[in-house]
UniProtKB/Swiss-Prot annotation:
CDD domains in the record: TGS_ThrRS (cd01667), ThrRS_anticodon (cd00860), ThrRS_core (cd00771)
Cofactor binding notes: Binds 1 zinc ion per subunit.
E.C. numbers: 6.1.1.3
Name the UniProt record assigns to this protein: Threonine--tRNA ligase
């Protein structure tokens, strides 16, 4: 006798079904057209193969190809088809792993001769053939003995290693697509034909097996796939636009910074780049002052013992830089480390001197330079470096002050992003992971506060910010908010964080005296807005395509002469611009004015003031904006007034206009 289960549907209805019914049979019972469009089903939020039995009661939903959740399946299946195509064309190739990643997928292959870009065209053609065959995906559960034997006979030794690493309590799944098969956790769609043709192989790269430089080098083929051609075209167009906006190229053209092999992941800031960096710091320093933060500075180098207390030496050591004094190089009496994070130093500052509940909240902020070892292959311009500056802050407060502090941080973060033109923001609350410190009661309390804060934010900023909850994604020491912004070409960047910490104050014995004269452990909030200031500057350069807002631009104005007869006049104008706080230089070179304009435009100078004999006689200038072929004739007074207003940072504009 079959067991009956109760299923809840998205429309709120509930029905009973046999437990052994499959997802496909469920779809067919609803409608034949739904079954034809179905690619998988979801039970209590977990995506499953349509061939899987339902097995239990729960919230069920049929996933069709138009569903956003189908995109991961399309890409996953595409990775399998890529592997089959490679082995059809190059039979000696071993397949290893092929996961879905952001915006696409990849597959790593082991062969003596690495693939080239020319090979991708051939492989892609073969993939389209395989998709056209429309072979069904079929799942089998194998014993470990059978799996080891079959893959060993195929000389798929990387797969054998993977099989040996799978825990005994997990099923060993094999997915067929026609005659070809692969080891895989699944799930998959019904057939290769459901993938469609909206895919493209993107590039070839090297990758170490399991990311370990001691292991063999493999060839990685990257690809992308979408549900339809329009989405694929939009993505490829975005990539073209991103290449034009690449901050590394613009950094060279604008003479902002450079890197060199003696300091991998370390930035050499040039004058203009450093000016932009300082503009960012000055902006944030004013915002922090308005929100009653105390700016501090903790040492760059600290003894290992402190990092052992904080826990970093145990769980973050491989990402840290050791520092051993040269005089002690042999006996290693002291081992120091360059700080990878600012938080332990801020706890020491909080502990210096007795604190009362009346002193709280205490908000400590630092533009702290931190060092983290990143693999050389992951370094990427300003976006991924080994030495960077965090706009870090740590708030020490009472439990009763926690919600208000989180809301205040939220307001500061959102207004900051708005000042830089970012209007599409998403906020995610990450809750307790499996491995964590602190009691369940402590987590229950903290999460209830954070969820309450999230609801308040949703109400206050209705329609302006997208919110979601990510179960199990919090840090081991507390739940957190993550802020993600969308740039001018639709890319998302995770920047701001608000992170509760139950761990560090306890480790260092931080306390304050409460109203009953008892010692109490403060609540500690980690908070960042830009995150890495270097990375945020890279995001800004790409978002604005180098055409920075006047207040942030490293070189705001160039006064360029048409003739030497206007040289003295141009110098006087430049002096007047500087006198009102504008960044201006004079170009008196004996070059044609079009040459000067073209050169300064390449360097992304926002405003060029053109001066000739006529302008000198009429006390005027011709203003030319970056990206515009037009010039506007203005009096010097009007030009200075206009540019002074534009160059005022947005936070100061609010004060002026209040």
């Amino acid at each position: 006798m079959s067991c009956s289960i109760s299923l809840s549907f998205p429309d709120g209805s509930k029905r009973n079904y046999p437990a052994e019914m499959t997802g496909l049979e469920l779809a067919e019972s609803i409608s034949k057209s739904l079954a034809k469009k179905a690619v998988a089903y979801s039970l209590d939020g977990i995506t499953r193969d349509l061939s899987d039995s339902l097995g239990q009661s729960g919230q069920v939903e049929i996933i069709t190809r138009e569903d956003s959740r189908a995109l991961e399946l399309i890409r996953h299946d595409c990775a399998h088809v890529l592997a089959e195509a490679v082995q059809e064309l190059f039979p000696e190739t071993q397949v290893t792993i092929g996961p879905v990643i952001e915006n696409g997928f990849y597959y790593d292959f082991a062969r003596q001769q690495p693939f080239t870009l020319d090979d991708l065209t051939i492989i892609e053609k073969k993939m389209r053939e395989i998709i056209q065959r429309n072979k069904p995906f079929r799942k089998e559960i194998w014993s470990r003995e059978k799996a080891r034997r079959v893959f060993s006979e195929k000389k798929e030794f990387y797969k054998v290693e993977l099989i040996n690493s799978i825990p005994d309590n997990q099923d060993l799944k094999i997915y067929y697509q026609g005659e070809w098969f692969d080891l895989c956790r699944g799930p998959h769609m019904q057939s290769t034909g459901q993938i469609g043709n909206a895919f493209k192989l993107m590039k070839v790269a090297g990758a170490y097996w399991r990311g370990d430089a001691n292991n063999p080098m493999l060839t990685r083929i990257y690809g992308t796939a979408f549900a339809n051609e329009n989405d694929l075209k939009a993505y490829l167009h975005m990539l073209e636009e991103a290449e034009k906006r690449d901050h590394r190229r613009l950094g060279r053209e604008m003479d902002l910074f450079h890197f060199q092999e003696e300091g991998p992941g370390m930035i050499f800031w040039h004058q203009k780049g450093w000016k932009m960096f300082q503009n960012l710091i000055n902006y944030m320093r004013r915002r922090l002052d308005d929100h009653q933060y105390a700016e501090v500075n903790a040492p760059q180098v600290l003894d290992r013992s402190l990092w052992e207390i904080s826990g970093h030496w145990g769980w973050y050591k491989e990402n840290m830089f050791k520092a051993i004094p040269a005089a002690e190089d042999l006996d290693h009496e002291h081992i120091y480390a360059l700080k990878p994070m600012n938080c332990p130093g801020h706890v020491q500052i909080f502990k210096h001197g007795l604190k009362s509940y009346r002193d709280l909240p205490i908000r400590l902020a630092e533009f702290g330079l931190v060092h983290r070892y990143e693999p050389s292959g992951s370094l990427h311009g300003l976006m991924r470096v080994r030495s960077f500056t965090q706009d870090d802050a740590h708030i020490f407060c009472t439990d009763e002050q926690l919600a208000a502090e989180c809301l205040s941080i939220n307001d500061l973060i959102l207004s900051t992003y708005a000042d830089f033109g970012f209007k599409e923001i998403s906020l995610k609350l990450s809750t307790r992971p499996e491995k964590r410190v602190g009691s369940d009661a402590l987590w229950d309390h903290a999460e209830s506060i954070m969820e309450s804060v999230l609801k308040t934010i949703e109400t206050k900023f209705a329609g302006q910010i997208k919110t979601s909850i990510l179960p199990g994604e919090g840090a081991f020491y507390g739940p957190k908010f993550e802020y993600t912004l969308k740039d001018a070409i639709g890319r998302e960047w995770q920047c701001g964080t608000t992170q509760l910490d139950f761990n560090l104050p306890e480790r260092f014995g931080a306390f304050y005296i409460d109203k009953d004269s008892e010692k109490r452990q403060p609540v500690m909030i980690h908070r960042a807005i830009f995150g890495s200031m270097e990375r945020f500057l890279g995001i800004l350069i790409e978002n604005f395509a180098g055409h920075m807002p006047l207040w942030l631009a490293p070189e705001q104005i160039v006064v360029a002469t048409i003739t030497s007869e206007a040289n003295e006049y141009a110098q006087k104008i430049t002096a007047r611009l500087k006198a009102v706080g504008l960044s201006a230089t004079t170009d008196l070179r004996n070059e044609k004015i079009n040459y000067k304009i073209r050169e300064h435009s390449l360097q992304k100078v926002p405003v060029i003031l053109v001066c000739g004999k006529r302008e000198a006689e009429t006390n005027s200038v011709n203003m030319r904006r970056l990206g515009s072929p037009n010039q506007t004739l203005l009096s010097v007074e009007d030009a200075i007034k206009q540019l002074s207003n534009e160059s005022t940072p947005p936070d100061l504009q609010r004060v002026i206009n209040a």
